[in-house]
């Protein structure tokens, strides 16, 4: 793990450059640093996928946000239909996402939020109200969606029902 300068290109047609306010630390990032990556991961890589920030620039095909909008980045692909589809191995259309250049090498990842800026596909950027506190919203893009999504979408727990959550990490606390 190193802290260094990277070069971001201008956003592609369907990309958004986000000036970041805050970023969460997902346990999957720790796994990537400690172990060999899963298929589809490439090194060097900018890690991070859950963050909040403000749109600094956008590609000409991006319609759902504009410069100055506050946004959340996430690991979930909007799939251009507002139906979340998980990114598989942090790729889109089976292609690793190259988002910056470092020491002459292309750097990959889906959102790369452990930086001052993130260059991400519009498919992993969601608008949020500009008056929402940005210091606590970064975890919405992963921990909240995963924990709350497991309870509401997967288990379909109804009001008044009880469940036991084992594990009081970021995801468990959001369940």
Model-predicted segments: where are they?
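Short gly/ser/thr-rich secondary-structure transition/capping motifs
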Residues: 1-3, 36-37, 108-109, 145-148
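Conserved hydrophobic/aromatic beta-strand scaffold that supports enzyme active sites
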Residues: 3-5, 52-54, 117-119, 125
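Glycine-rich beta-strand-centered segment in the early N-terminal region that forms part
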Residues: 7-23, 36-86, 129-131
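Cytochrome P450 core scaffold surrounding the K-helix E-X-X-R motif
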Residues: 28-34
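Residue-level marker of beta-strand positions
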Residues: 69-70, 117, 162
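Cysteine-cluster motifs in flexible loop/terminal segments that predominantly coordinate metals
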Residues: 74-117, 122-123
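Mid-domain Rossmann-like dinucleotide-binding core that forms the NAD(H)/NADP(H) cofactor-binding site
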Residues: 123-124, 129-175
């Amino acid at each position: 793990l190193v802290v260094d300068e990277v070069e971001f290109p201008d956003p592609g047609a369907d990309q958004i450059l986000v000036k970041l306010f805050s970023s969460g630390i997902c346990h999957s990032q720790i796994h990537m640093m400690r172990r060999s990556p899963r298929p589809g991961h490439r090194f060097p890589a900018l890690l991070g996928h859950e963050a909040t920030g403000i749109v600094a620039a956008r590609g000409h095909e991006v319609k759902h946000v504009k410069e100055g909008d506050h946004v959340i980045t996430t690991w979930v692909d909007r799939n251009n239909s507002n139906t979340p589809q998980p990114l598989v191995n942090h790729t889109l259309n089976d292609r690793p996402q190259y988002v910056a250049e470092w020491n002459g090498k292309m750097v990959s990842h889906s959102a790369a939020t452990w930086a001052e800026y993130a260059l991400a596909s519009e498919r992993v950027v969601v608008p949020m109200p500009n008056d929402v506190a940005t210091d606590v919203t970064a975890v919405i893009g992963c921990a909240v969606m995963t924990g709350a999504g497991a309870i509401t979408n997967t288990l379909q727990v109804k009001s008044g029902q009880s469940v036991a959550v084992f594990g009081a990490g970021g995801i468990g606390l959001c369940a």
